[in-house]
C-alpha cells in the first residue's frame, strides 16, 4: 500500500529472502496439514493495510481512544458478516486466536476449579479442551471423554453416563482431529441432562458449516467458538458466536478487558474479507470439494491393508492414518513425506501408545490443495504417492522420482 516489495527487499534483504523462500516452499509443496489453507490476495491485502496503526480498545461505539469512527465501520462489517454467515445474533470478532476465544468462554461461564468435560487429546480433542500442559487443564478440572475403542466414533451414551457421574459445569464439543460428523443436538441433550453449558469449538469445521456441509452447532450451543483460518480460509484469528444476550455481554468483557487489550483491526479487516468470501455462493462448491478430496485420499489408504484409516474414513476435511505397520511411527512418516515435498503432521490416534513427539499416526487434510484447484483425481494421485513413498522410505531413487512428480503437479496448480 505504501511500502512496496522492492523497497522492502532493499531495506531488509535477509528477511525478504526468508519470506521469498517460504513462498517458494508453499508453491512447490503439497500442503496436507488440516489446519492450514491458502488465503486470497484480498485477505492478505486487508491484513497488510495501515489499519495496524490504530489503537481501538473497546467495541464499536464504545472506544477508549478517539479517531475510531472508521475503525468502527471496519469492525462492524466483520461482526455483521459473521452473524449473517452463521445465523447468529451476537458475534465477537476480536479474539487473536481460537485459544483466546476458548479462554474467553471459560472466563465467562465457569470459575477456576470447576469441572469441565472435553474430548481427549488422543481421540481428536484440542490442547485447550483440557490438556494438562494447557492453561485449560491447569485452571479447570477437566475430565476427558473418549471415542469408542472399536468404532473410534463418539459414543454419546457413554458421554452421557460420564456426565451424570462427574456433573460438569461446562461440556466442550468439537475437535482438531476427528473425521466424522459431530451430533451437536445430542451434546445439547447431554448438557441439559446435567445442567451444564455447552460450548462448541468448531475451529476445524467452520468453513464446512458455512458452506452447508456440516450441521451447524449454533442452534444447540450456548456459545460457539472458531478460528477464522483453517477451512474458513481467512487470516489467523478467533471468533465467538452466541444467541444469548447476557452471555454475549460476559464474553465481550472477557475478551476486553479480561484477556486482551487493543484489537488487531488490520486482522479484523481481513476477517471481514474472508467472511464476505464465505458468503459467496462459490464457497459452497469449495466446501463440497474439500470433503470429496479428503474422501478420495482416505479411499486410497483404505485400499492398502498395511495402512489403517481411523474410524474407516471421513465425512469432513481430514482423516487419520495409523502408519505403524509401514514405518516406525508418525514422526518418521512426516519426515519421509517432507522429503518428497508433501507436508502434513504426525498425530496421535485414539488410545495412543506412543508419545506425542512420535505418535502412531499422521493427519491428512484437504483444505489447501482444494484452494489450489486440485480435485479428486489429483487427491487420489497424491495419496498414491504418499503410500509409495512410505512403503519405499529406504529407497532414495523412489523418493527422488516422487519428488519430481510432485513438482509437475504443483507447477500445474499455482499457489497464486
From Swiss-Prot:
One of its GO terms (biological process) is tetrahydrofolate interconversion. Its EC number is 2.1.2.1. It is found in: Cytoplasm. Pathway: One-carbon metabolism; tetrahydrofolate interconversion; Amino-acid biosynthesis; glycine biosynthesis; glycine from L-serine: step 1/1. The keyword Amino-acid biosynthesis applies. One of its GO terms (cellular component) is cytosol. (6S)-5,6,7,8-tetrahydrofolate binds at residues 121, 125-127, 355-357. It comes from the Bacteria. The modification N6-(pyridoxal phosphate)lysine is found at residue 230. The record marks 229 as: Plays an important role in substrate specificity. Transmembrane segments: none annotated. It catalyses: (6R)-5,10-methylene-5,6,7,8-tetrahydrofolate + glycine + H2O = (6S)-5,6,7,8-tetrahydrofolate + L-serine. InterPro entries: PyrdxlP-dep_Trfase, PyrdxlP-dep_Trfase_major, PyrdxlP-dep_Trfase_small, Ser_HO-MeTrfase, Ser_HO-MeTrfase-like, Ser_HO-MeTrfase_PLP_BS, SHMT-like_dom. GO terms for molecular function: glycine hydroxymethyltransferase activity; pyridoxal phosphate binding. Catalyzes the reversible interconversion of serine and glycine with tetrahydrofolate (THF) serving as the one-carbon carrier. This reaction serves as the major source of one-carbon groups required for the biosynthesis of purines, thymidylate, methionine, and other important biomolecules. Also exhibits THF-independent aldolase activity toward beta-hydroxyamino acids, producing glycine and aldehydes, via a retro-aldol mechanism. Homodimer. Belongs to the SHMT family. This is Serine hydroxymethyltransferase.
